[in-house]
């Protein structure tokens, strides 16, 4: 069940990210491994089982990234970035929390056009782009309460299993984190 959102600028407990090859170290449900490791479009994969999947925007703003995001993107902690947090919903239930972080947010950045994305899933755009590069996944497990702009009832008890990778167009990165909500698995 959703609750009103609260704003976070930093996580209370930043997750510890590990390379996806170490997935056996996560205490994650076995059926989730394919989802965490699949490099194809998550949107397309979800739509196989949930054709009516939709997007609920939680936040879309210009703000400072999390410490781990700034380190991953090799940018100063004080640098503001474009951040979009959404739920991917199936039958009215949130199943994935997705967080997009784009540094160097200006008109010369090829990602700048995403400001008009609205309620469309990011995956519909990403996987249509030619010459797009993607870094290997990193994975983690953390409680739902630790993700910015994510509020669920009992979020202190709800675990998420997440993956992140960077998409690169030219010299411009886009960091995408996708957290699978345990209670919806």
Swiss-Prot record:
According to its UniProt record, where is this protein located? Cytoplasm
Q: Which domain of life is it from?
A: Bacteria
**Which EC class does it fall in?**
lyase
Provide GO CC annotations from the record.
cytosol
- Name the pathway: Cofactor biosynthesis; ubiquinone biosynthesis
The record's Gene3D superfamilies line, in alphabetical order, gives:
Chorismate lyase-like
Which protein are we looking at? Answer: Probable chorismate pyruvate-lyase
From which source organism is this entry? Hydrogenovibrio crunogenus (strain DSM 25203 / XCL-2) (Thiomicrospira crunogena)
Whichever gene encodes this chain, its name is ubiC
């Amino acid at each position: 069940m959703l609750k009103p959102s609260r704003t976070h600028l930093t996580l209370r407990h930043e997750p510890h990210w590990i390379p996806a090859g170490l997935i056996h170290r996560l205490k994650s449900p076995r059926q989730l491994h394919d989802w965490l490791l699949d490099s194809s479009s998550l949107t397309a994969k979800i739509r196989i089982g949930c054709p009516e999947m939709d997007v609920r925007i939680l936040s879309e703003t210009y703000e400072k990234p999390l410490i781990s995001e700034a380190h991953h993107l090799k940018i100063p902690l004080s640098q503001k970035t474009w951040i979009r947090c959404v739920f991917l919903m199936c039958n009215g239930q949130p199943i994935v929390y997705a967080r997009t972080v784009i540094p160097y947010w200006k008109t010369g950045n090829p990602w700048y056009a995403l400001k008009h994305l609205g309620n469309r899933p990011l995956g519909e755009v990403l996987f249509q782009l030619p010459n797009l590069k993607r870094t290997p996944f990193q994975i983690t497990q953390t409680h739902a309460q630790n993700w910015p702009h994510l509020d669920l009832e009992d979020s202190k008890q709800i675990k998420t299993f997440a993956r992140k990778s960077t998409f690169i167009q030219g010299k411009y990165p886009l960091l995408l984190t996708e957290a699978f909500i345990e209670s919806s698995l």
